[in-house]
Amino acid sequence: MLIKLLTKVFGSRNDRTLRRMRKAVSLINAMEPEMEKLSDDELKAKTNEFRARIEKGESVESLIPEAFAVVREASKRVFGMRHFDVQLLGGMVLNDRCIAEMRTGEGKTLTATLPAYLNALSGKGVHVVTVNDYLAQRDAENNRPLFEFLGMSVGINLPGMPAPAKREAYAADITYGTNNEYGFDYLRDNMAFSPEERVQRKLHYALVDEVDSILIDEARTPLIISGPAEDSSEMYKKVNKIIPHLIRQEKEDSDTFQGEGHFSVDEKARQVNLTERGLVLIEELLVQEGIMDEGESLYSPGNIMLMHHVTAALRAHALFTRDVDYIVKDGEVIIVDEHTGRTMQGRRWSDGLHQAVEAKEGVEIQNENQTLASITFQNYFRLYEKLAGMTGTADTEAFEFSSIYKLDTVVVPTNRPMIRKDLPDLVYMTEAEKIQAIIEDIKERTANGQPVLVGTISIEKSEVVSRELTKAGIKHNVLNAKFHANEAGIVAQAGYPAAVTIATNMAGRGTDIMLGGSWQAEVAALEAPTEEQIAQIKADWQVRHDAVLAAGGLHIIGTERHESRRIDNQLRGRSGRQGDPGSSRFYLSMEDALMRIFASDRVSGMMRKLGMKPGEAIEHPWVTKAIANAQRKVESRNFDIRKQLLEYDDVANDQRRAIYTQRNELLDVSDVSDTINSIREDVFKATIDAYIPPQSLEEMWDIPGLQERLKNDFDLELPIAEWLDKEPELHEETLRERILAQSIEVYQRKEEVVGAEMMRHFEKGVMLQTLDSLWKEHLAAMDYLRQGIHLRGYAQKDPKQEYKRESFAMFAAMLESLKYEVISTLSKVQVRMPEEVEAMEMQRREEAERLAQMQQLSHQDDDAAVAADLAAQTGERKIGRNDPCPCGSGKKYKQCHGRLS
């Protein structure tokens, strides 16, 4: 009560922020007559004037009123569009390192031109981030005339572009691209072998469109660049044959139900667990297939990879559904993004899941991959000096933006008041009744000439609705991941009178639905339209537009609630743009995933007690509240997962930053001989210490062992025993100095053969290659550690603290291993002529190029619950004899800590 009273008196934080910014808007409006008087050339010259002022020490913030006034005037001249005052407010919010919540149709694309221009004046570059390639290209091409009029260059960063084209795009003042491509370019730059191969500049200002989709929906999925591992496709096929013999246990959590099933599914946590009965059957079937020996256990250390295959196959069959989670196209399994409904070409699930799905669908199984580099969006976007974003729906996630990204959310008012009617939810007992009610609603509304957009949560559901509409004889368009090439065209005409459009979550985000359809699309379809044709098209459109307004505007039907209220709001936001009329309603059934998993059985029990007949719906505030609570539960669970992922990834992030900084320093220098000399001393000291303990008696020295080690690891044959026999006065310190001096002498002789320049080149190549190889193995070891670390909780230890402690020890061991491997490689390599060194360098580059071609870019399904699932199935995951040792030494497990066990 007191808070409400204080808010009434002083206004909310949002109100106070907008009040402060409105003063600047008044200044910009006051400058408008002055800007209108300037000629085109004088207006263009303002850009160079602003740049000169920044170089003299003026801050970018002090230029806001003038710069925004210049962009507004340029927009009037180039596009014939004037920024509204609310768009100026939005631009200031975006410059203020905040999230601007602007409703659909309020002109976010035009708003973005203001902060993009302002922050590009410093010459450090601006990255505008969009959710897909189509929007990146569209926005870049749409805004290019404005920016080029003001003397700014525009670049587009698309997947598959050659490195020179990417460098050119990043060198532009303003670069448009997708979140994935920016992230992958960052990882690729940190795998480059020369400074010339890098494409990105220092990360300065990122302006993220649909910021909720990128920083929240996709935050759980790290970007991973991986290379091929060994082929195990046959094993996936064999295990896949066994899974159909297993029966799902329906109600494992019931006290009275005696389960007959072989595995249980936890839909909430997306986990699959074998029951005791299932384990016995699986072991019998594996023995029958000749995969496992009789009497062996699936949980024995030797079968841990087999358990991995069984778990992956079980998850593929029980949790992943065709046309919901993925589609099969041209013999390839393509992931469907659960949040946008778009296909993710080239992306693959990790942990063998993608191969298991390929086996299930009977398509060619591609090799498993090994992680070469990875980063989460959370950590990538926090690398920018300045970050801001805009979306139509951010307020529900304001706490997460603030706690993880330190970004405040500011709700920007609409230009015209919103008059859309959001009708209460209707809840039916069954899916069939719900679909029938939707069809009736569509019939009724289209009869009045009202356009309808039907939002579904998966391709499968969109096709179910489509089939029913076809049966009812209702003409309609379908927009889902299978047909997304037509996306913009379908969305542009979804506002036609009586048009019916079915869309998955992709729902053409970024494309406005114009009431009466898009006259611009009709004009664009003509080859060389005359003025008369354009005038006629506009006149026809006006008639249609008025008819749709009279019918009540665009009606939105949601076929079920999404896990997140924000995505429901996005669907609703397709209607009622720019003060247009519109309406929306969600239809639910007790068979919907959200209701089944989160709304308790009491709701359906209550509905039966109320004596509901087939086809009847319940419309009650209590039910709406229960649904909102269910959504809140899912949102908070997903937030916890993202937060937990970030806390674990922060540990890896510190290490990643250290490695990438060291690697970039290496790339930027041509001579690393000082570093080599320094680490040679460390390596030889540590090696000699193992055989001649410091300040020890001569009887404790292992001279034969030391001689053998120096010969095997450093190609250094030294008669140490002979020296000690002939020179009794030779003590420990002088012996150490002599061994090091001999190693330096041998190395210098090699250098004399090939020349100093070639040797420096070779040293740098060896250091980079060794660093990359060990970092790759370290990432795999960190994955192993991460998957089993939650089990430490049973020993009353904090898994996060244990993970920090052990990963730090592994990192320190990796750095020691790096020194050793570099000196060992440089000492053992036999070089004769400069041509041979050049040939070796060529071979290394060819290998790097081959690997680059085989790299997979993937979104890992790194839900904390999924990681825990695999670890819980396998116990603390055992390491194969030929796997890299988790200690980070770079050696195989059997040659390192495997000896101890």
From Swiss-Prot:
It is an enzyme of class 7 (translocase). Its main location: membrane. Keywords: ATP-binding, Cell inner membrane, Cell membrane, Cytoplasm, Membrane, Metal-binding, Nucleotide-binding, Protein transport, Translocase, Translocation, Transport, Zinc. It comes from the Bacteria. The keyword Transport applies. Its EC number is 7.4.2.8. It is found in: Cell inner membrane; Cytoplasm. It holds the Pfam family SEC-C. Belongs to the SecA family. Part of the Sec protein translocase complex. Interacts with the SecYEG preprotein conducting channel. Has a central role in coupling the hydrolysis of ATP to the transfer of proteins into and across the cell membrane, serving both as a receptor for the preprotein-SecB complex and as an ATP-driven molecular motor driving the stepwise translocation of polypeptide chains across the membrane. This is Protein translocase subunit SecA. The lineage of its organism: Bacteria, Pseudomonadati, Pseudomonadota, Gammaproteobacteria, Enterobacterales. The gene is secA.
